[in-house]
């Protein structure tokens, strides 16, 4: 995979940095694994805006990705690596020995023709999925479940991974890329290796139009609004906030922690580094 620096033929091209997709499949996705995806534009069922700065963007079909990996003992052959417009990671189309095809998150180094396996007897090889109790301590893992059988919820983005630190009783300690250490049940499954497309962090959009294609609308600063529209608004000429930064509804922002989930607090051994 290569990084493409665009020639400065226009202001939008000047700062753009793209990621090469030459190694990805060029054809259409596997139709039985596609679902329609409708734009909500940040509105709820009443038509009220619940998420600001959403709307427009290119239409995409949703690719149904297998996050459970529960076909134990059945080898799967990787047919191709594909681009997925709905996520930063690439996806791989695998065909099981019984003929079923599924999409999975593509780990780094996976190529067409490779054979993957799931279950407690699977070898320790990139792309194989095992219960955490069967994974050696110190291994790099991704697509980690938080509850057994629920499907992967952690380390699914491009270039992400976690490290298995230790096992104590029925729980294991896993360190995330953020530095946070969590306790996860040893019956939860994880996939060996790290997620592919690690160069995604080097991408530079270059112009606002790319953001619009992604369905993200402009963000207006509160200090340029009127007092009726934002707590930071008003004043003669160019002024600052005049107070601690808040959102349009007066809630503290810029670093104010809002997490309040006592039910899962006990599973966090150490918080991420700020």
Swiss-Prot record:
Query: Per its record, what are the GO molecular function terms?
Result: rRNA binding; structural constituent of ribosome; transferase activity
Q: Which PROSITE patterns match?
A: RIBOSOMAL_L2
* Span list, region Disordered: 223-256
Q: Which InterPro entries match?
A: NA-bd_OB-fold, Rib_uL2_dom2, Ribosomal_uL2, Ribosomal_uL2_bac/org-type, Ribosomal_uL2_C, Ribosomal_uL2_CS, Ribosomal_uL2_dom3, Ribosomal_uL2_RNA-bd_dom
Specify the domain of life of the species encoding this protein: Bacteria
Q: Which UniProt keywords apply?
A: Ribonucleoprotein, Ribosomal protein, RNA-binding, rRNA-binding
Compositional bias of kind Basic and acidic residues: 229-246
One annotated Gene Ontology cellular component of this protein: large ribosomal subunit
Q: Name one GO biological process term.
A: cytoplasmic translation
Family annotation (Pfam families): Ribosomal_L2, Ribosomal_L2_C
Please report which protein family the annotation says this sequence is part of. Belongs to the universal ribosomal protein uL2 family.
Q: What does this protein do?
A: One of the primary rRNA binding proteins. Required for association of the 30S and 50S subunits to form the 70S ribosome, for tRNA binding and peptide bond formation. It has been suggested to have peptidyltransferase activity; this is somewhat controversial. Makes several contacts with the 16S rRNA in the 70S ribosome.
Assembly, per entry: Part of the 50S ribosomal subunit. Forms a bridge to the 30S subunit in the 70S ribosome.
The record's listing under HAMAP family reads: Ribosomal_uL2_B (MF_01320_B)
Q: What is this protein called?
A: Large ribosomal subunit protein uL2
Give the originating organism.
Variovorax paradoxus (strain S110)
Gene name of this polypeptide: rplB
């Amino acid at each position: 995979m290569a990084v493409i620096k665009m020639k400065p033929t226009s202001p939008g091209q000047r700062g753009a940095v793209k990621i090469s997709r030459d190694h990805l499949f060029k054809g259409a996705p596997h139709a039985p694994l596609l679902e329609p995806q409708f734009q909500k534009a940040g509105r709820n069922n009443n038509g009220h805006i619940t998420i600001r700065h959403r709307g427009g963007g290119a239409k995409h079909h949703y690719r149904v990705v297998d996050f459970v990996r529960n076909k134990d003992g059945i080898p799967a052959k990787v047919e191709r690596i594909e681009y997925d417009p709905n996520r930063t990671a690439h996806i791989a189309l695998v065909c099981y020995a019984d003929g079923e095809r599924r999409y999975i998150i593509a780990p780094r180094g996976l190529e067409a023709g490779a054979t993957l396996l799931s279950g407690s007897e699977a070898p320790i090889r990139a792309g194989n999925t095992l219960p955490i109790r069967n994974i050696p301590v110190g291994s790099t893992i991704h697509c980690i479940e938080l509850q057994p059988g629920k499907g992967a919820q952690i380390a699914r983005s491009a270039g992400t991974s976690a490290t298995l630190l230790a096992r104590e009783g029925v729980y294991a300690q896993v360190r995330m890329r953020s530095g946070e250490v969590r306790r996860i049940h040893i019956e939860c499954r994880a996939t060996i290796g790290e997620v592919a497309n690690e160069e995604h962090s080097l991408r530079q959009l270059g112009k606002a139009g790319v953001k619009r294609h992604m369905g993200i609308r402009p963000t207006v600063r509160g200090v340029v609004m009127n007092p009726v529209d934002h707590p930071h608004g008003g004043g003669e000429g160019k002024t600052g906030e005049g107070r601690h930064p808040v959102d349009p509804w007066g809630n503290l922002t810029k670093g104010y922690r809002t997490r309040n989930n006592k039910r899962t607090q006990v599973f966090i051994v150490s918080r991420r580094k700020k």
